[in-house]
Amino acid sequence: GGQDVNAYGATTDFTWVTGSQYIYSFDKCFFMPADFTGGLEYNQDNLTDDMWGYNRYTKQEVRIASAFFQNEWKNKQWSFLLGGRLDKHNMMDHVIFSPRANLRYNPTENMNLRASYSFGFRAPQAFDEDLHIENVGGTVSMIELAKDLTEEKSQSLSISGDLYHRWGDFQGNLLIEGFYTSLSDVF
């Protein structure tokens, strides 16, 4: 046993986010009342991790500038949402567009049916938790990002049915939900 004095070090991980959002409600947008939402976001993460005994020094600055928008048409029985997000990550040379869509149908006031699609990504970067998870088991990992890494992509589909019923002062709820997620370029 005993402690491994080489395993000690210092980590700082400072993250901050700022953004703004605008919402506009239409009495009628093409065929139905709608709410438009648009906005901007900026996210920065500064990670420094020094493990002196193993000569492992990590310094990483991540900056992500984003713009997002969506329009949701809705009435009592239907809602249909189309939206997207543009992200520019400083560790990638291109902008990523992530679309999303959602459909809701209420055939009765006690039944809610939904279907949704979304696309997402994760940029190749070192995460603080990846640097230290092996330490818990008594080993140390040396992490270096490969130069040819591309973003990890995900596509998700989900469907659900939600039923509600009241018995006097009590309400019951039955939710049945299924989803599928496909990952590509996993790192």
Region spans (language model):
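Membrane-embedded beta-barrel scaffold of Gram-negative outer-membrane proteins
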Residues: 1, 106, 114, 148-187
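Outer-membrane beta-barrel strand-turn architecture
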Residues: 24-30, 72-77, 97, 105-109, ...
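Membrane-spanning beta-strand positions in outer-membrane beta-barrel proteins
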Residues: 31-37, 79-81, 102, 106, ...
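Residue-level preference for beta-strand/loop junctions
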Residues: 12-14, 32, 63, 95, ...
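Membrane-embedded beta-strands of outer-membrane beta-barrel proteins
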Residues: 16-20, 67-69, 99-101, 115, ...
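Face-selective signature of the C-terminal outer-membrane beta-barrel domain
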Residues: 1-93, 175-177
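A structural preference for long, well-packed, hydrophobic secondary-structure segments
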Residues: 62, 80, 94-98, 103, ...
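Outer-membrane beta-barrel domain signature, especially the mid-to-C-terminal portions
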Residues: 51, 59-61, 98, 123-153, ...
